[in-house]
């Protein structure tokens, strides 16, 4: 530890103690909050099933920065490079299309064995795994419907895919000793005016009930469902709306996934957390950055990211909220995108843990809104960066932008050689 860091740490300890905050306790709490990194930033959501296929489902990854991962070996190497530069506990979130097999595997036939390499890698890197069925980028999703499809055979294919995915998820949890959160998102919807909005939702309701009919140990597997306002090509009607999935998660007691980009631009998920937690047992968060639409830009340390973190900490939701990231930017170095977004999420959590919440709550309860606002603003100037730097040092990761040197060296030595 350098003398400069020691001095900054001691000063920070004194400054935060003056407002009733124990920074050592804040760092202990931060180590209770893993962030689940999404594998698909590394290859623009291509996967290994059909890497040259088109990305469908009303989502887009824009840009053509060189060096994207082309196979599982490259993707895991890129992830390892990112993991080394991010302090504290992490998880990895996989989609079904990231299976590994020497022969083609239909999505309704995926099995745990197709993900055994990921499990062994996760063990070696001390990571938990989360999972997602992939209900897009497939011939049987080309007309815009999957679990709500009017054709019973096609609908059953997607039901069976999701059921098979749950078995993979439970395998992850059993092998790694930490529950895998499996999130179901489907692109189902219509481009233009829709006459029958009820029937697809009735079919989706019945399909989901069949999907979750097999019981798994919650210590191994947790179901989550995710809504969306619209997607490209499904601007007028989305089967899995917010109201549909809020009702489903409440009535079936599954986890509810809130994606920062899946609502109207004037809505924020930070305001939805406390409301949803009254009715559902768990929340899965997909922290993202929507720019005018669900663009999935890299997460910033901005007001909404901070507000999301603050809601988790202020209400002590550590054991009920699962923090995941969901962005994919192909216009910049993909390893750097992981590092920037994940570090920003962790910085937001740290800042939330350093807030004098008890004091603020007392001011609010007493009606002293002037002091509440004043203290909220003044605490932004407290030396949280020194606490972050100490956290990084203790986890043997760069504290400032020095991590970029490592990414540039990796790009020169590895990424630039990929065609």
Swiss-Prot record:
Q: Pathway of this protein?
A: Carbohydrate degradation; L-rhamnose degradation; glycerone phosphate from L-rhamnose: step 1/3
One cellular-component annotation, GO: cytoplasm
Q: InterPro entries in the record, alphabetically?
A: L-rhamnose_isomerase, Rhamnose_isomerase, Xyl_isomerase-like_sf
Tell me the domain of life.
Bacteria
Comment on bound cofactor: Binds 1 Mn(2+) ion per subunit.
Provide the alphabetized UniProt keywords: Cytoplasm, Isomerase, Manganese, Metal-binding, Rhamnose metabolism
Q: Name one GO molecular function term.
A: manganese ion binding
Cofactor(s) this protein cannot do without? Mn(2+)
Any idea where this protein resides? Cytoplasm
Fetch the Pfam families from UniProt.
RhaA (PF06134)
Q: Which residues bind Mn(2+)?
A: 262, 294, 296
Q: Which GO terms describe its biological process?
A: L-lyxose metabolic process; rhamnose catabolic process
Q: Which PANTHER family match?
A: L-RHAMNOSE ISOMERASE (PTHR30268:SF0)
Tell me how this protein assembles: Homotetramer.
Q: What does this protein do?
A: Catalyzes the interconversion of L-rhamnose and L-rhamnulose.
Q: Report the sequence similarity comment from the record.
A: Belongs to the rhamnose isomerase family.
Protein name as catalogued: L-rhamnose isomerase
Whose protein is this, by species?
A: Salmonella newport (strain SL254)
